[in-house]
C-alpha cells in the first residue's frame, strides 16, 4: 500500500481507496494531473520551418542523401514550393513526366519559373514535358542540381514566384 501511495504521489494522482474488510483487494480511483509517457506519442507536433514568413526559402546545401532547406534536412528528391517542401516521387531524370510535374500546375498564384535539378549533370527532358510547361505559361530552367539550387536561391531572394524540383546528385559526383 505504501508503494502505491508513493507511486501516486510521484505521478500527481489523487486517490480514494475503497477496501472491503473481507478481502485484501483495494479499488483505487483517482485522477491524473499530468500525462504519462505513452500519451506523449499520441500528441500532434508541429515543426516550424521558418521563424518569419518573409524570410523566404533558402537551400543551404545538398548531398547524395538530400537537401538542407531552411535548416531542415529533406531526404531524397523534393519539390520546393515556398513555403512548403514536399517529397517528390521520382528516381532519376528519366522519371520526370507530365504527371510527376502536375503538382506545379495546381499552385495558386501560378509560379513564374520552375527550376529543375536533374542530379550531377544537366539532362534533357522529354519534349512533351517541356511543351506542357510552356502551354501552361511556366518558364523552366533545367540544370544540374548544384546550379539549380543556386538559381532557385537567387530567384527566391528576388521575391520571384519560383519553385524547384530537385534530384540529389549521386555519391562521388561533386
UniProtKB/Swiss-Prot annotation:
Domain of life: Eukaryota
Presence of keyword Transferase: no
Record organism: Danio rerio (Zebrafish)
GO cellular component entries: mitochondrial inner membrane; nucleus
GO biological process, alphabetically ordered: mitochondrial respiratory chain complex I assembly
Xref: PANTHER family: NADH DEHYDROGENASE [UBIQUINONE] 1 ALPHA SUBCOMPLEX ASSEMBLY FACTOR 3, NUCLEAR PROTEIN E3-3
InterPro entries from the UniProt entry: MTH938-like_sf (IPR036748), NDUF3 (IPR034095), NDUFAF3/AAMDC (IPR007523)
Localization (cell): Nucleus; Mitochondrion inner membrane
Family: Belongs to the NDUFAF3 family.
UniProt function note: Essential factor for the assembly of mitochondrial NADH:ubiquinone oxidoreductase complex (complex I).
Keywords annotated in UniProt: Membrane, Mitochondrion, Mitochondrion inner membrane, Nucleus
GN (gene name): ndufaf3
Record-annotated disulphide pairs: none
Flavoprotein as UniProt keyword: no
Identification of the protein by name: NADH dehydrogenase [ubiquinone] 1 alpha subcomplex assembly factor 3
